[in-house]
């Protein structure tokens, strides 16, 4: 069986778990890992793999799995698609998916490559489950309740804000698809908490939700990477009222 040669682009939490997934996949082989530091301070688990700064240094890459922050996905995907390399990402800014699809669709077709976008759990697998539930009960309302748990995308977004030393963003469900964001941060020296908190609340990841920012002495003491979702569809199948379908999932979020 010919194996697909995959490159891991970015080696944070997502990259680490993609490595494990590829190691367990019988139809894939790891071409190497692309990270900003290259082979400098190479983690022990990467000892047997090529670790480079530029994907061009790897041989025979057929697909690049993008494990970068969401806001970097478009840049890397366009670069690799232009090289004829297929891409897979877990882009998770819901309001930006249509624009990203339009951009990467054009780039992929131009260079005869394939780009699979938003292949995480939400957006991703949850999107498929929602569609299935809506097919079962075509008339009705679907409620998506996340957590309580750590949101990886929101946590990464907070860490990128000036003045934030460490961060944890928790998603708290309040029911019927409404959520509260609880953000815990450690502050860098020389920054005012009120200004940093205001910047967090103004970020696109948080601007549409009730968000509370808390200053804590240690984010690590609060850290639990568990997350989950409850999808509920209440509606009508044919002429039968009060149909109720649920899907529950609990996961290790970075995986």
Predicted regions, residues:
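Rossmann-fold NAD(P)-binding glycine/threonine-rich loop
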Residues: 91-115
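Gly/Ser/Thr-rich loops at beta-strand to alpha-helix junctions
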Residues: 12-14, 94-97, 118-126, 148-151, ...
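N-terminal glycine-/serine-/threonine-rich beta1-alpha1-beta2 phosphate-ribose binding loop
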Residues: 1-82
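General beta-strand structural signal in soluble alpha/beta enzymes
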Residues: 89, 115-119, 145, 168-169
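C-terminal substrate-binding/catalytic lobe of Rossmann-fold NAD(P)-dependent oxidoreductases
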Residues: 16, 24-55, 149-255
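Rossmann-like NAD(P)H-binding beta-loop-alpha module
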Residues: 125-145, 154-155
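A short alpha-helix-loop-beta-strand transition element characteristic
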Residues: 113, 139-143, 163
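Generic structural signal for hydrophobic
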Residues: 79-80, 108, 158
């Amino acid at each position: 069986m010919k194996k697909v040669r995959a490159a891991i682009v970015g080696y944070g939490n997502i990259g680490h778990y993609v490595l494990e997934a590829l190691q367990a996949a019988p139809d894939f082989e790891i071409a190497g890992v692309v990270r900003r530091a290259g082979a400098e301070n190479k983690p022990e688990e990467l000892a047997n793999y090529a670790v480079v700064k530029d994907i061009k240094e790897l041989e025979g890459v057929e697909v690049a799995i993008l494990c970068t922050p969401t806001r970097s996905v478009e840049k890397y995907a366009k670069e690799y698609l232009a090289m004829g390399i297929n891409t897979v990402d877990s882009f998770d800014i819901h309001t930006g998916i249509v624009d990203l699809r339009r951009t990467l669709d054009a780039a992929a077709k131009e260079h005869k490559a394939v780009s699979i976008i938003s292949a995480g759990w939400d957006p991703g697998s949850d999107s498929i489950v929602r569609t299935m539930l809506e097919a079962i009960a075509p008339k009705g309302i679907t409620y998506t309740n996340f957590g309580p748990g750590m949101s990886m995308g929101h946590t990464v977004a907070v860490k990128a804000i000036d003045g934030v030393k460490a961060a944890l963003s928790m998603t708290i469900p309040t029911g019927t698809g409404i959520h509260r964001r609880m953000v815990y941060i450690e502050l860098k020296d020389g920054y005012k908490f009120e200004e940093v908190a205001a910047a967090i609340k103004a970020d696109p990841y948080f601007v549409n939700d009730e968000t509370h920012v808390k200053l804590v002495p240690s984010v690590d003491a609060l850290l639990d990477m568990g997350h989950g979702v409850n999808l509920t569809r209440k509606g009508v199948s044919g002429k039968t009222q009060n149909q109720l379908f649920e899907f529950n999932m609990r996961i290790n979020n970075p995986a």
